Amino acid sequence: SSTVAVKRKNMKHYSVGSIIWIIVEYASLIFFGFCAIIPIVSCITTAFKTDAEYQNTNVMAFPGSWLNFDNFVNAFKTANMGRAFLNSVIVMVVVLTVSVIVGSQLAYVLNRFKFPGNGFIRNLYTIAALLPAVAMQVTVYQIMSDLHLVNSLGGYIIMSCGTDVISMYIFIQFMENIPLSLDESAIIDGANYWQIYWKIMLPLLKPAIVTSCILKGVGVYNEYYAANLYLMRKEIRTMALSLYTFVGPMGSKYNLICAGVIISLLPALIVFVCCQKQIYSGITAGAVKG
């Protein structure tokens, strides 16, 4: 056909080195694609296997029955995943609300008001972002312990609401595309800065809010290290920490762990399917049009 002829004609313009490089690129993509898919397939197949099937078959072998939901039921009950999910939702709602309000207000001040020390404050937040969180946990844990906030869901929420530099810079980036004429027009109409923030800035920052909530929400939902450090009581564990129930000194029940992993992924998958349009628009939007 004419299409095939055109493709063959275009291929003549490629050198041997270019063709080899294209082959290497596609081969690399296929290889890394398999590397990403294999653990997911292994997790799904293992979640449906009985204990005997898991011990006597390899991880990629299909289970005897895809209708074996015993692992899911046992994982949900044993790890008290219903309560863990509720705890995760509480943490996420509070942390994301605080992150959006504080981050957007801080970005509004740093972007709209030019005052002595503006650049210094930005540099301080940049330095805070460069400090590894693990290295600061000793000091943070001592402070939380002195305040009797360890082993408390409220204390963990307060700790998780700490400096969110990424969200602040996301809001600053979006605000730079919002014309100052909107602020000036609102001031002429009698609005103060507080009203400008709530009635003009915040509604226009919806794409940035979506982006910030995605980045922060995924991190909070999947957080294991800090949750394991501050949430020791079973009734206040989060979803990520509840999976540790099946790990013991006598071994790990990987079929139950895989079932728990799938259960913990379902809420995030449902949110993604229902809100994928807003998610994509929030990530790709680089400007706000007035």
Identify the residue ranges that each predicted region occupies.
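A structural signal for multi-pass alpha-helical bundles of membrane permease subunits
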Residues: H13-G17, W21-G290
